[in-house]
Amino acid sequence: MIYAVFIFNNKGKPRLTKFYTPIDESIQQKLIGDIYAAVSTRPPTACNFLESNLIAGKNRIIYRQYATLYFVFVVDEGESELGILDLIQVFVEALDRCFNNVCELDLVFKFQEIHAILAEVVSGGLVLETNLNEIVLAAQNQMPKTKRSNAMPFSNTLSSFATRF
């Protein structure tokens, strides 16, 4: 079972937090800090798996760093570490496809879409889908279509304003 999913930047700011077990909010905040501290202080050559007792007894923290972001899954002992690493890879590739090279700002300003993509991959702590194409297709069908404005672009408005004077 997957207990929680986090995305942190390299400064420790959580960009996505999703708990699949009921945990008091004050404890959640402490867990987020503890997990970031455990992951961020490891050398780059260290293994991407950590044994932990932070959530629901004995569990594992499995993470992967991409540029300035840490993608972290907290799972029970029944989950395959390599399977979760692959799942993180699939999740990141789905984000990349949906946002054309996802960056930290996408995580900040499009958090609802990020949660929708995660919901296509994991629900209730269980893995739902690992097929990248299916995840992207389902997520794109859920994302709101942005409407084009009929208003004049700002640059045209500014130039027409300047010609009047």
From Swiss-Prot:
Q: How does it sit in the membrane?
A: Peripheral membrane protein
Query: What InterPro entries does UniProt report for this protein, alphabetically?
Result: AP_complex_ssu, AP_mu_sigma_su, Clathrin_sm-chain_CS, Longin-like_dom_sf
Listed A to Z, the keywords are: Cytoplasmic vesicle, Golgi apparatus, Membrane, Protein transport, Transport
One BP annotation, GO? intracellular protein transport
- State where the protein is found: Golgi apparatus; Cytoplasmic vesicle membrane
What PROSITE patterns does the entry give? Answer: CLAT_ADAPTOR_S
Q: Which GO terms describe its cellular component?
A: AP-3 adaptor complex; cytoplasmic vesicle membrane; cytosol; Golgi apparatus; intracellular membrane-bounded organelle; nucleus
Please give one Pfam family short name.
Answer: Clat_adaptor_s
What function is annotated for this protein? Part of the AP-3 complex, an adaptor-related complex which is not clathrin-associated. The complex is associated with the Golgi region as well as more peripheral structures. It facilitates the budding of vesicles from the Golgi membrane and may be directly involved in trafficking to the vacuole.
For this chain, the family text in UniProt reads: Belongs to the adaptor complexes small subunit family.
User: What assembly does the database describe for this protein?
Assistant: Adaptor protein complex 3 (AP-3) is a heterotetramer composed of 2 large adaptins (apl5 and apl6), a medium adaptin (apm3) and a small adaptin (aps3).
| Protein's name in the database | AP-3 complex subunit sigma
Q: Which organism is it from?
A: Schizosaccharomyces pombe (strain 972 / ATCC 24843) (Fission yeast)
What gene name is listed for this protein?
Answer: aps3
